[in-house]
């Protein structure tokens, strides 16, 4: 799984605030001057930065569905409405589905549930992220769907490798795929999307929260750290809360 980050700009006394406030996202690319060595140094450092692991799903109007593992999920705001963000490297079928439907479901995972890390690992790999269907004209795999698709073409042998058995997947009232045994699901509508270099940053409003079958109190978070899926545990002394 690649580690993904977006640029963050903060105000500075050396620049007028109104310039930063009205700086268009389309201009971000011109500020990319990182050398190859700098990119590698950044990548190595970020491997020591623990990131939350979620699975995001969406769908197209024709009934096709898409999903992937993401490590860029971030809660943005709580009030007046919960808002979250995540980013996806493009090109991506999942990003295309989100842009078409303007909806996404974020599945929170637990290290206490073994199949959650299995889901995340398999959906992070390109060959397992999709259920390939044969394109008879080009004789190649070209369709990327999660189980439950309305597509009726003949599947290739690679579809047998799909990590999500249909019993794991249900549909939301909007028709998006849900992983029924997730720790929790955030049903969201997209409110903003911005292309930042080779990623798209999505900002979404959380319309409803659905708790999974596992008790939250007995579940440990699932994070990605140093190229491995890891559990979380409190340090001693336990910090009850951290708020800026």
Swiss-Prot record:
Enzyme Commission number: 1.5.1.36
GO MF term (any one): flavin reductase (NADH) activity
Short name of any one Pfam family annotated for the protein: Flavin_Reduct
Catalytic activity: a reduced flavin + NAD(+) = an oxidized flavin + NADH + 2 H(+)
UniProt cross-references to SMART domains, sorted A to Z: Flavin_Reduct
GO cellular component, one term: mitochondrion
Biased composition (Polar residues): 132-158
Keywords, comma-separated and alphabetical: Mitochondrion, Oxidoreductase, Ubiquinone biosynthesis
Example GO BP: ubiquinone biosynthetic process
Region annotated Disordered, chain positions: 131-158
Major localization class: mitochondrion
InterPro entries linked to this entry: Flavin_Rdtase-like_dom, NADH-dep_flavin_reductase, Split_barrel_FMN-bd
Top-level EC class: oxidoreductase
Subcellular location: Mitochondrion
Phenotype of gene-disrupted mutants: Strongly decreases cellular coenzyme Q levels. Increases cellular sulfide levels. Decreases coq4 protein level; addition of p-hydroxybenzoic acid restores protein level. Sensitive to hydrogen peroxide, copper(II) sulfate, and mildly sensitive to thermal stress. Decreases growth on minimal medium.
Function of the protein: NADH-dependent flavin reductase that acts in the coenzyme Q biosynthetic pathway. Required for synthesis of the p-hydroxybenzoic acid (PHB) precursor to form a quinone backbone.
UniProt protein name: NAD reductase coq12
Natural source organism: Schizosaccharomyces pombe (strain 972 / ATCC 24843) (Fission yeast)
